[in-house]
Amino acid sequence: MSSFHATTIFAVQHKGKSAMAGDGQVTFGQAVVMKHTAKKVRRLFGGKVLAGFAGSVADAFTLFEKFETKLEEYGGNLKRAAVELAKEWRSDKMLRQLEAMLIVMNKDSILLVSGTGEVIEPDDGILAIGSGGNYALSAGRALKTHAGDHLTARDIAKAALETAGEICVYTNDQITLEELE
């Protein structure tokens, strides 16, 4: 049975601000675009946390709910909530079946959370996941390195997603962009 997947999520911290962008394409199997305007980036915990997913849509919704519960349980402590989610995701027989990855961020931290138990904080304040993730990551790193005062975190996130959308067939130009200050 085919699943709904394929996307690009990009997140960056730059000059004291954080931005996350995701495209809107949902692909069924390897050949059919089912939706162009999906929202894969969300605000959680009263708007103080951004979360984006790549992978199975149904699995991602389950993980969003679990992560938000962990945020509430740990008083908004992003790192603790991410570690506890990763531990549960890896150890729970049912959750282990979920096929998705998350990027979560607040104004201070950005983390990749995976079902294999990884919680990774990048050295450079940039993360990207999904089918177009490597394209977005490359574009974002170049832009951040050479941006100086000319580009904001929002500008970098938007341009990185646009670049990925021009290259990756599973990424489109219907971008959802959220920013934290």
From Swiss-Prot:
Cellular component GO terms held in the UniProt record: HslUV protease complex; proteasome core complex
- A GO term for molecular function: threonine-type endopeptidase activity
Question: InterPro entries recorded for this chain?
Answer: ATP-dep_Prtase_HsIV_su, Ntn_hydrolases_N, Proteasome_sua/b, Proteasome_suB-type
Q: Where is the active site?
A: S2
Grouped into one coarse class, the protein's main location is cytoplasm
Question: What PANTHER family does this protein map onto?
Answer: ATP-DEPENDENT PROTEASE SUBUNIT HSLV, METALLOPROTEASE TLDD
Protein known as: ATP-dependent protease subunit ClpQ
Task: Please give the organism.
Answer: Bacillus pumilus (strain SAFR-032)
